[in-house]
């Protein structure tokens, strides 16, 4: 099968350079700064509104109509939620269901790690790249990858 894919960035992992998101109205440059800048309740509401509206099932239907057959979905290391981060598993579950209904495949991209893998805004921490300096953080990321594999391995849209 020839793949015709698109990236669904700035949905579950915020990337300011991509435009419309809670970051686009903030003074900070990364998701960590957003946590520090916005009151907790406001942040949760802004993130949930963004995640529910930025990408929808209508987008998946349109992608299928124009010949796309694969969507790459960047996900954060905190996909299951943490003390500071809202879970986004519901949205990834929805994406898998939408993809299956539209005949699309999903490529999960673990796009962030604790304390950033690259020092860019898409790592959650601008100008910081400290993930690989601690074995516990590395082990945590392996656990996240294994949990994602367990959850979606048998899904027809994978």
Regions found by a protein language model. Give the residues of each.
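N-terminal carbohydrate-binding accessory modules
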Residues: 1-68
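A cross-domain feature marking catalytic cores of carbohydrate-active enzymes
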Residues: 6-10, 73-77, 108-112
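Short, solvent-exposed loop/turn and secondary-structure capping segments
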Residues: 15-19, 83-84, 117-119
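Residue-level signature of transmembrane alpha-helix interfaces in integral membrane proteins
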Residues: 23-26, 119, 125
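Residue-identity detector for glutamine
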Residues: 29-32, 102, 117, 133-135
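A short alpha-helix capping/helix-coil boundary motif
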Residues: 37-40, 73-76, 127-128
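An active-site-proximal structural segment forming one wall of the substrate-binding cleft
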Residues: 44-71, 81-112, 122-158
């Amino acid at each position: 099968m020839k793949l015709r894919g698109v990236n669904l960035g700035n949905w579950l992992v915020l990337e300011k350079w991509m435009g419309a998101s809670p970051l686009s109205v903030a003074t900070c440059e990364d998701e960590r700064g957003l946590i520090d800048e916005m009151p907790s309740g406001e942040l949760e509401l802004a993130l949930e509104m963004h995640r529910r509206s930025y990408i929808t099932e209508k987008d998946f239907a349109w992608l299928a109509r124009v010949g796309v057959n694969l969507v790459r979905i960047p996900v954060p290391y905190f996909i299951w939620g943490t003390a500071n981060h809202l879970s986004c598993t519901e949205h990834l579950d929805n994406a898998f269901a939408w993809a299956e209904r539209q005949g699309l495949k999903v490529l999960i991209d673990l796009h962030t790690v604790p304390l950033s893998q690259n020092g860019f805004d898409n790592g959650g921490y601008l100008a910081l790249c400290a993930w690989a300096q601690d074995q516990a953080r590395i082990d945590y990321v392996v656990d996240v990858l294994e949990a994602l594999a367990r959850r979606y391995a048998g899904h027809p849209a994978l």
